[in-house]
């Protein structure tokens, strides 16, 4: 049988259920010869169908043509096995007693062998007729055995693979082009096939020189009812060409034809490639995302003045992990207790000046508080996604000496301003007494304070940027993790902004990082952390003086804004818009400032001296997005030397101011979801400070 010509049609499942026959009652009805003939034919077909080796439920679904086709196929298969026994190509092995069951019937090995195959058995004649197909074909192609037996194989092969399949059926893979109805054998084919047939009939087996020509292994696309996407399944045919005995075919003249080579093979499905594999499991169906991101914000690289090659080998080179929408920014780092902790990027955070150490407010309580923090994040309205930043330990710097800062005041009555200049210290590193509530401009800069207590900087800023009011990165220098012990000062629970982490403290390492805007409601106020009440710079504020304080101007009693230096600071000066009043009471010794990387306030014993070895600097570290108000009760920060630690006196005062809100004609407080941070001072905004009573303190460079 050759490849069917004409339109390309494929086989399908078209079994028809036979019509149920009813017995006619003998009566007065007239006899119909044609009807009696059909009845006899149907009876014979039913008897023939019952002889087929199929179950009754399968036989009941067969039509008349299927019964005849399967009967012919069954007879041909039976004739093949009879011919094998006559030619004695192989002798059937004797069955041992173990091969019989307890009932005396032999074990059905054929069924077990078919079930163990990764595929199904198939025999295709030289004409392309399916001589035999095992019952396991239904598991791979969806066609039942009765559907394909004695059918044309080309109805199941893809139209583009039919020519290749026809070549595989020829012993030389070069089938001759013959006219339909004539014998496809040529003289060469007859000679070769005759030689092979005589060798096989004599029991010698196939000659070795022809074995390579008779082995087949190829791939074709086969019609499949189980795959609804394309309708074809790629299958691998692996087997050999063997003679199909017992067919007893004849030429039109009546001459018997010799047996033909047929394909005996096992058909197995080919595994699809990785790109074509279906994503069936839940893990593979998940949205693909980069597990680790090692890119760094360009603004952070500009601040640190480091190129990509310098940042890549650093241990603190940030690795980001994005989950969902970037609504809440989180930072995660490993604490000194060898467990991971998280901190909100937009909330206030205690940090240590001169180093990358952060005070984790929930590290001391372990995983329980970490779970509480996660619960807070899930409760927040804006907590639809999270962004975690991993930070690693960074190198430590050498200890630095404490230097005394000498300041002198020059008053100019005409201009109504006061100029502050710093005098170089001639003594050894020591401590000095500075009233609380005051701060000093950045070293190397001159601060001008007018009679209305407006501060400005005149000299160029030549140091790296510390803290400024923007949403850019903030680099933190290195410092040892154990140089500062947390204080136990009380923090008012209703601080402005209420962006304080949970209670408890732990040190973990951080460096310069970039954060994204996060919408997060108020968080609980931290208790027991130094200088913890934080006023977010997102809220525009204005300070008012009390009456009678306009003429009091001292360098040691004025509040100011701490600014870093460098080009970044000149472009992004910290400012407070004049849209809201912030009224402070002078009795509470307030201090309103923004922290920077070069200054801190240390309370210590006025009689302390520099001991053996150099002392380290200690000061609270603040987030780059907030200003700091000193806490309400006194707290104790101390210096650690190589030989001893000296504690400050208990009379130092560190109180948070009482903030009063007053309505204005202009728009009132910003909305809670307002996250925009101004980068520059409005020209009409002014910062008025109130001098307060002095207290002991020390300023560090």
Curated annotation (Swiss-Prot):
Pfam families: HLH, PAS. One of its GO terms (molecular function) is transcription cis-regulatory region binding. There is a cross-link at residues 583, 660 (Glycyl lysine isopeptide (Lys-Gly) (interchain with G-Cter in SUMO2)). Highly expressed in testis and weakly expressed in heart and liver. Highly expressed in small intestine and cecum in a male-dominant sexual dimorphic fashion. SMART domains: HLH (SM00353), PAS (SM00091). Residues 555-701 are annotated as: Needed for transcriptional repression. Residues 1-38, 360-389, 409-436 are annotated as: Disordered. Residues 365-375 have a biased composition (Basic and acidic residues). Keywords: Cytoplasm, DNA-binding, Isopeptide bond, Nucleus, Transcription, Transcription regulation, Ubl conjugation. It is found in: Cytoplasm; Nucleus. GO terms for biological process: negative regulation of DNA-templated transcription; negative regulation of transcription by RNA polymerase II; nitric oxide metabolic process; positive regulation of protein sumoylation; regulation of transcription by RNA polymerase II; xenobiotic metabolic process. Residues 25-78 form the bHLH domain. The keyword Cytoplasm applies. InterPro entries: AHR/AHRR, AHRR_bHLH, bHLH_dom, HLH_DNA-bd_sf, PAS, PAS-like_dom_sf, PAS_fold. CDD domains: bHLH-PAS_AhRR, PAS. Residues 12-24 have a biased composition (Basic residues). Induction: Increased after TCDD exposure in liver. Highly increased after TCDD exposure in kidney, spleen and heart. Up-regulated by 3-MC in small intestine. Residues 414-430 have a biased composition (Polar residues). Residues 106-176 form the PAS domain. One of its GO terms (cellular component) is aryl hydrocarbon receptor complex. Interacts with ARNT, ANKRA2, HDAC4 and HDAC5. Interacts with ARNT; forms a heterodimer with ARNT. Mediates dioxin toxicity and is involved in regulation of cell growth and differentiation. Represses the transcription activity of AHR by competing with this transcription factor for heterodimer formation with the ARNT and subsequently binding to the xenobiotic response element (XRE) sequence present in the promoter regulatory region of variety of genes. Represses CYP1A1 by binding the XRE sequence and recruiting ANKRA2, HDAC4 and/or HDAC5. Autoregulates its expression by associating with its own XRE site. This is Aryl hydrocarbon receptor repressor.
């Amino acid at each position: 049988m050759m490849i069917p010509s004409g339109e390309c049609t494929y086989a399908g499942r078209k079994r028809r259920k036979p019509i149920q026959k009813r017995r006619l009652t003998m009566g007065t009805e007239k006899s119909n010869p044609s009807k009696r003939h059909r009845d006899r034919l149907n009876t014979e077909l039913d008897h023939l169908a019952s002889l087929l080796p199929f179950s009754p439920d399968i036989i009941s679904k067969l039509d008349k043509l299927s019964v005849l086709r399967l009967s012919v196929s069954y007879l041909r298969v039976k004739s093949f096995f009879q011919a094998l026994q006559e030619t004695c190509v192989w002798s059937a092995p004797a069955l041992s007693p173990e091969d019989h069951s307890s009932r005396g019937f032999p074990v059905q090995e054929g069924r077990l062998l078919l079930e163990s195959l990764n595929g199904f058995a198939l025999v295709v004649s030289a004409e392309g007729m399916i001589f035999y197909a095992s019952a396991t074909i239904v598991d791979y192609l969806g066609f039942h055995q009765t559907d394909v037996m004695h059918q044309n194989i080309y109805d199941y092969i893809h139209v583009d693979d039919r020519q290749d399949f026809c070549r595989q059926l020829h012993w030389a893979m070069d089938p001759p082009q013959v006219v339909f109805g004539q014998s496809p054998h040529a003289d060469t084919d007859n000679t070769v096939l005759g030689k092979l047939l005589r060798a096989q009939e004599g029991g010698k087996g196939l000659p070795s020189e022809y074995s390579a020509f008779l082995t087949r292994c190829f791939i074709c696309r086969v019609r499949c009812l189980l795959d609804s996407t394309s309708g074809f399944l790629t299958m691998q045919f692996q087997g050999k060409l063997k003679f199909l005995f017992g067919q007893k075919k004849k030429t039109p003249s009546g001459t018997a034809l010799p047996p033909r080579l047929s394909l005996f093979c096992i058909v197995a499905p080919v595994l699809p490639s990785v790109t074509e594999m279906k994503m069936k499991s839940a893990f593979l169906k998940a949205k693909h995302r980069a597990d680790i991101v090692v890119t760094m914000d360009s603004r952070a690289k500009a601040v640190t003045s480091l190129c990509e090659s310098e940042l890549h080998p650093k241990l603190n080179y940030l690795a980001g992990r994005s989950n969902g929408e970037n609504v809440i920014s989180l930072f995660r780092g490993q604490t000194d207790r060898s467990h991971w902790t998280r901190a909100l990027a937009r909330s206030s955070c205690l940090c240590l000046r001169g180093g990358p150490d952060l005070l984790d407010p929930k590290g001391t309580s372990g995983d329980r508080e970490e779970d509480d923090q996660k619960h807070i994040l899930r409760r927040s309205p804006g907590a639809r996604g999270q962004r975690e930043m991993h930070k690693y330990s960074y190198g430590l710097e050498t200890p630095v000496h404490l230097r005394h800062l000498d300041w002198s005041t020059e008053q100019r009555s005409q201009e109504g301003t006061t100029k502050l200049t710093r005098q170089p210290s001639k003594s050894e590193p020591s401590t000095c007494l500075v009233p609380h509530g005051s701060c000093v401009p950045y070293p190397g800069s001159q601060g001008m304070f007018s009679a209305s207590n407006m501060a400005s900087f005149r000299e160029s800023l030549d140091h790296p940027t510390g803290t400024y009011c923007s949403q850019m990165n903030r680099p933190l220098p290195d410092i040892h993790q154990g140089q500062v012990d947390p204080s136990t000062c009380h923090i008012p629970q209703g601080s402005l902004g209420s962006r304080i982490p949970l209670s408890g403290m732990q040190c973990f390492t951080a460096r310069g990082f970039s954060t994204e805007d996060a919408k997060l409601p108020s968080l609980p106020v931290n208790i027991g952390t130094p200088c913890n009440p934080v006023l977010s710079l997102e809220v525009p504020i204005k300070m008012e003086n009390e009456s009678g304080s306009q003429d009091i101007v001292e360098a040691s009693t004025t509040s100011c804004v701490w600014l870093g230096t460098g080009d970044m600071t000149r472009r992004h000066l910290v400012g407070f818009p004049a849209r809201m009043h912030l009224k402070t009471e002078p009795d509470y010794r307030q201090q309103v400032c923004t922290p920077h990387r070069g200054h801190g306030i240390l309370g210590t014993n006025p009689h302390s001296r520099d001991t053996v070895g150099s002392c380290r600097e200690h000061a609270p570290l603040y987030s780059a997005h907030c200003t700091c108000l000193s806490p309400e009760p006194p707290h104790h920060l101390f210096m650690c030397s190589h030989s001893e630690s000296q504690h400050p006196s208990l009379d130092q005062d560190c109180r948070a101011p009482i903030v009063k809100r007053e309505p204005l004609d202009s728009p009132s407080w910003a909305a809670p979801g307002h996250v925009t941070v101004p980068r520059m001072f409005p020209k009409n905004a002014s910062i008025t400070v109130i001098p307060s009573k002095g207290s002991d303190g020390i300023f560090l460079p």
